[in-house]
Structures are given as C-alpha cells and as structure tokens.
Amino acid sequence: MRNNKNQMYIIKIFIALAMITGIIFLCLLYSSLTPSKLKIGVKTSNMDDSPKIKFTLIDQEGKKFDSTHLQGHLSLIYFGTTYSLYDNQTLKRVEDIIKILKKENILVQVVFITLDSEHDTSEVLKKYLEKIDDNFIGLTGRVEDIEQLADQFKVFFYTSKIFDVKTNKYELQHSNFVYLISSQGKFLKHYYLGLPKNG
C-alpha cells in the first residue's frame, strides 16, 4: 500500500516537472509506458538496486547535514553555484514545481549543493536561497567532500578557461540534472529541465 502511495507521489512529481518544462505529452507517456521504456528527459532506477546516498556536509546555517536527513520524505537535489544564471533559473523552476506539488499535499525537500564550496560558504548560500525560497536547503563543505558526492551522482563539472567579468571568476561548467531521492535516501530518477544555457 505504501509503495503504491509513493508511486503516485512520483507520478505527480513527474507531471509537475512536465508542466513546468512544457513537455506535457511526457505525462501521457509516463502513464502508458514502463519506466524502462521512458527515455525522454528522465532516467529511472530500480530502487531496490540503488545504493543509499552517503555524505556529510554543512548547511546554510552552519550546521552538519548528512545523508540521514534525506530519509523520511522525498527530496529533489540540484548541484550548481550561486553565481550561475543558469542555476538560478533552474532553482526558480524547481520552486514552481514545489508550489504545484504543495497543492497536491506532496511535500518534497529541495537540496541545493554547491560545486564551488570555496566561494559558496554557508553565509553566501543563506543569502542566495533567501531570494529564491528560504525553505530550500543549501549545502557546502570541503572540496574533497563535494567531489566525492558529485561522483556518487555522476555529476560532471570542471572550471573552464572562460573568465566571467561579472563574477570575477572563471566559469564552472557542469551537468544539469535534478535528482529525485526516495524517502529511503536512494536515487530514483534524474530530470533535465531543458533550460537554455546562459552561463
């Protein structure tokens, strides 16, 4: 019974994502195709085979936040930086998704993990997320801890040779997916929101 409830929540999350990204027809595909056949914009995973995500980082309040905080509810995780316009647009779309889900009484925890912890301290993350949604959780930590976690999610990122005069930094390029984590702390799916590349 609980599995059916979780599956319904996942379906509604997918529909919300589709509404925001303008790919409504995927909802119809989702209702008629098995997860293994659904290949457009989403990758699924067998939850029984998926390992639990493990990490320990620091949130925007300067407190320890580890992988146990992902258990007990669904979570959406996104990796990025506070100075990227692209990441800002993505998080605002995630905020729109959360609003839709709240109307369906589905509570989803949103976790934003910086890929540039040397710049994005707890204080920087707090000020940044207050402008988007202060219910979002922002995580930073040691460079090696961020790299290990990014590796668990198969996040690809590197610092390019393009210098951004607005941020006075070299651009950090990275893969752009939103990850859905189960209430057991396991990877379920990842989504591409299809935003234009703006930096």
UniProtKB/Swiss-Prot annotation:
Gene3D superfamilies: Glutaredoxin. CDD domains: SCO. InterPro entries: SCO1/SenC, Thioredoxin-like_sf. It holds the Pfam family SCO1-SenC. PANTHER family: ELECTRON TRANSPORT PROTIN SCO1/SENC FAMILY MEMBER, LINALOOL DEHYDRATASE_ISOMERASE DOMAIN-CONTAINING PROTEIN. Belongs to the SCO1/2 family. This is SCO2-like protein RC0042.
